[in-house]
Amino acid sequence: MNLVLIFLIIIFSSSLFFYGRSKTKSLAISGNIKLNALPKFYGYYLVLWCSIPALVFLLIWSLFEPVIIKSIIIDTAAKQGAIFNDKNEANLVYEKIKAIHLGTYLGELDSILKESALAYAKFINIFTNSKVVLIFGIIIASTIYSLKKIKNNNKARDDVEVILKGLLFVSSLIAILTTLGII
C-alpha cells in the first residue's frame, strides 16, 4: 500500500510541476508581470511543497503503525483471556494472529485467536484508510498553501534553494549518524 501511495504522490507532484510552470507563464504573459524566478522554479516549489510533507508523514506513519497495532492486538488478546507469562509469549501470540489473518496459520484455532485475528483485520483496515485520508489531506493542504504563495509572485528560486539545502543537511546528518552507528 505504501508503494501505491508513493506512486500517487509522485504522479500528483509531477502534474503540479507542469501546472505551476504553465500557470506562472500565463500570469507573466497575461498580466505583464515580471516573474521573480524562472517558471520552472515555481513548478519545483509546488513539487517540493506537495511531496515532502506527504512523504515525511508516510515515513512517520510507517514507522509507528506496526508498533501501535501490535500493542492494541496484544491488549485485545489479553482482554479476551489470553495469558502471557512474558514478552516472548505475547510476541508468539501476535505472530499467530498475523498468520491467521494472512491465511498461513496451520495450528489449532481457539476462540481467542479467532477474535483477535478479526480485531487485527479491523485495525489494519482502519489504519490503512486513515493513512490514505490523512496523506491526501496533507497533499491538498500543502498544495493550496503553495498555490497561494505562487499567486503572490514569491521568490520561488530562493525558496527552492532553502528547501534543497535543508534536505541536503538532513541527508548529511543521517549519513554521519549512520557512520557513527557503524563504528
Predicted features, each with a name:
Residues 1-8, 35-59, 160-179, 183:
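Alpha-helical transmembrane segments and their helix-start/interface "positive-inside/aromatic belt" motifs
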Residues 14-21, 62-65, 129-152:
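Transmembrane alpha-helical segments in integral membrane proteins
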Residues 23, 27-28, 64, 68, ...:
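Membrane-interfacial segments
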Residues 2-26:
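N-terminal prosegments of processed precursors
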Residues 18-37, 155:
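Membrane-interface helix-loop junction between the first two transmembrane segments
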Residues 57-137:
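Alpha-helical transmembrane helix bundles of large polytopic membrane transport and channel proteins
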Residues 34, 38, 72, 138-143:
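Extended, highly charged clamp/arch subdomains and adjacent linkers
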Residues 151-163:
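Intracellular loop-helix junctions on the cytosolic face of multi-pass helical membrane proteins
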